[in-house]
Amino acid sequence: MSIVDELYSEIDNGREGRNLGLKTGLPKLDWYTGGFQKGVYKLIFGQSGSGKSSDLYRILRDYPDRDIVHVYFSLEMSSKVLLAKLLNLYIYDTYGIEISYMTLMSVREKLSDKYYKYIQESRVWLNSIIHKLIIFDKQ
């Protein structure tokens, strides 16, 4: 099939509603971008605390069976800190418990057995998504 044929095939797919991108969970962003489309790269950037990690988590959560690879560049945190943030989001989403990075790493006090149980139970999820992440960090 030539590139012209592929283009027209995509146009036909769109007319039949099959080119809808993966939803981001942010309707206004989906309106402007068409969601995440195959073969189209999106650059998401923002200030610290603006929700970039949450957006990444939402995609990992909502599309676990999709073969989507995420490249994450960070100049402010290491890979371990990013994974800790994703772990925290998963635990909050799954169990309704927020465990801060300071608590997770026992910075101020020893991590409780209750929290440790949730962290251990979440390890399977973290292992299931790690192959979908390519992280370039500040180190």
Predicted regions and their residues:
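Cytosolic-facing regulatory segments adjacent to core modules
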Residues: W31, V69-Q139
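The Walker A/P-loop phosphate-binding site
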Residues: M1-T94
